[in-house]
Amino acid sequence: MQVTQGDDVVGGLTKDDFVVLDENQPQPIVSFEHGDEPVNLLLLFDISGSMQKYIEQIAQTARVALDHLRPADRVAIMVFAKKTAVHQDFSDNLAESARQIGGAVKNWDVGTTTMINTAIVDAARYMQEHAGPGGRRAILILTDNLSTSFQLTDGQVIRELDKADTVLNAIVTGRAIRPDLPGPRMFPNPDYTPSNVFHLAEETGGEWVKAAQADQTFAQMIERIRTRYMLVYHEPPSQPGTFRHITVKLSNEAQKKYPSAQVHARTGYYAQ
């Protein structure tokens, strides 16, 4: 979870500055952390033709960007277009991870079209299988968001991210425009719904940013992922598989101090 005011991250908040509602019922916070837990970060790079220059920009400053991480943090790298491939397994060797980013667009035959939702689901499942217990989990996708949701709705993607306990963050390059959320008549065939990483990031409590230059934005997003808040409360009894809605907001006192603050938190979860 992240709290921002304008373009700035709001730091220094405590457990008492937050209110958590589960199906509109207040929940006591039993654990609170701010940037202390190790992070498992999966970098998910769109390597379709139009994206190569942006990955090259990131590669030039990758070592500085990954300096925002800590020694216990781990990084994995996946690439995608039509298919998805693991470029680097999870590693705590951050210098090597930075070096590997430069080669992420080479030696991979992942097709020519772009399947964003499929790639995010593959990344979520990889995270669930390989991240290991403990720590926070985050995916950072770099894409131009030019794709359709073939055979995978946003709801299905969000469910996979929820199962993997993973937050999606996005750097969206180029001239991509955020699509409207589909209404009942807008896209009669869900296979041709435009991809919407903006919506996916927001629903999982992540952040997105549009960027003409990817290198500086990459470093900023890494830092913001590293300094997120983590709140824990006990799940109320409910039928397994039921979707439960969550609202996280600042307390009245915190709202007075930060009147224009925005809380970026997941909007719900599926009961276990």
Indicate residue ranges for each PLM-predicted region.
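Scaffold/interface architecture of coatomer-like assemblies
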Residues: M1-Q272
